[in-house]
Amino acid sequence: MERIVDILRNLESIPSPSGLSDRVISYIEDLAGTADIGTRRTNKGGLVVGNHSSPKLVISGHIDTLGAMVSGINSDGHLALAKIGGPILPSFEGEYVTIKTSSGREFRGTLLLNNPAAHVNQEAEKTVRKTDNMHIRLDAEVGKKEDTEKLGIRIGDFICFDPRFEYTDTGYIKSRFLDDKAGAAAMLDAMLALGHSGLRDLPVAFFFSNFEEVGHGASAGLPATALEMLVVDKGVVGEKVGGDESSVSIC
């Protein structure tokens, strides 16, 4: 159990919103190497893991997550944002973020409602949260657009939300992006089990896609010889569905 938790903790520590998956793919490549299992990157940057040249079964999950992107720099130096995937903004409000610039620099910040103080804005509680009325406040002394531009922040830079990973004493894991890093961790644990038990040459491949949250995760790159596909992803919990936090859903 500790191995799979460690793998999940490592996956969660590497930001990977759709379009920014190279580091987490490299981590998986290194992990596969410890079990003498080969890897192949797809043209889209996903990863096929397996030694068999003609796999019949593909086990697939995704390592990309929800996120955001800088869509503009406001006159006060705050950042406008566009969503990557479908984050529900009220659940992300107040979250700390890392802005990753194209030059490799990183800056911290917070996602906030415009005019967020309830003492000033009497409509703050009632306001529908959307990208048009929210912003990223940088942890940097900026007061105008030019100040932010001097930091090297540009439109198109990635905004990564903190995962807040926690493994509780009662055996629960709480974190953002368990969709689908929990699934990926389970796949990697199974991959290592096969590799270390001498079964690494079975006609099985693991496929880690990297654009699922924007709608085209496993649409390309699957081995052409695959006859069956097993997809590992989150199980939905909510009204009128059969899932719960302690069960595996098969559909």
What feature does the model see in each segment?
Residues 1-251:
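N-terminal hydrophobic/helix-forming segments and targeting peptides
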